[in-house]
Design a protein with these regions (language model features):
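Short amphipathic alpha-helical surface micro-motifs
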Residues: 16-17, 30, 51-59, 89-90
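Compositionally biased, intrinsically disordered low-complexity regions
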Residues: 13, 36, 41, 46, ...
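A broad, low-specificity signal for short, low-complexity segments enriched in glycine/proline
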Residues: 5-10, 32-40, 64-69
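Polar/charged alpha-helical tracts
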Residues: 18, 22-29, 95, 99
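Short amphipathic alpha-helix that is part of the acyltransferase structural core
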Residues: 1-25
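Acyl-donor binding region in acyl/amide transferases
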Residues: 56-125
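Short intrinsically disordered terminal tails
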Residues: 128-129
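A short helix-loop-beta-strand connector motif used in the catalytic cores of GNAT acetyltransferases and
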Residues: 22-44, 49-52
Length: 129
């Protein structure tokens, strides 16, 4: 199963966009996709990019020098359940994000069209313990 298929199987709203595969490919081509695996099996996928603080998260924009990590999408199960396995996948995805972007000022999650803003370092300390 590919990362795109994993997201589509989860049924998240983004997977039903008419341009979803194009959108995903752009992020993947720009190294903005994290994939957590358990052996050969995908256990989670995240799409994230950097923006300047307060900048509108317009699609197809990534600012390497941005001080905000904007997480467009996270999927850690295909059935929407939260389990110890899905929580471990989320920790893995956050570790990938840290490796890719390093420390930032904020981390923003897009959850159902609503944005949740957190202090990056405080969030990572809590999430990765």
């Amino acid at each position: 199963m590919t990362a795109v298929e994993y997201i589509e199987l989860s049924g998240v709203p983004e997977s039903r966009w008419p341009n979803f595969r194009e959108w995903f490919k752009w992020h993947q081509d720009n190294y903005l996709v994290g994939i957590a695996k358990d052996g050969d099996k995908i256990s989670g996928v995240a799409v994230a990019r950097c923006l300047h603080e307060g900048e509108e998260p317009v699609h197809y924009v990534h600012r390497q020098d941005g001080n905000t990590a904007f997480v467009d999408l996270t999927v850690t199960s295909t059935d929407g359940s939260s389990t110890p396995y899905s929580r471990l996948a989320m920790k893995t995805l956050l570790s990938i994000l840290w490796s890719r972007f390093g420390p930032r000022k904020n981390i923003v999650f897009n959850r159902g069209g609503k944005r949740k803003v957190y202090d990056y370092m405080k969030f990572m300390r809590k999430a990765l313990l």
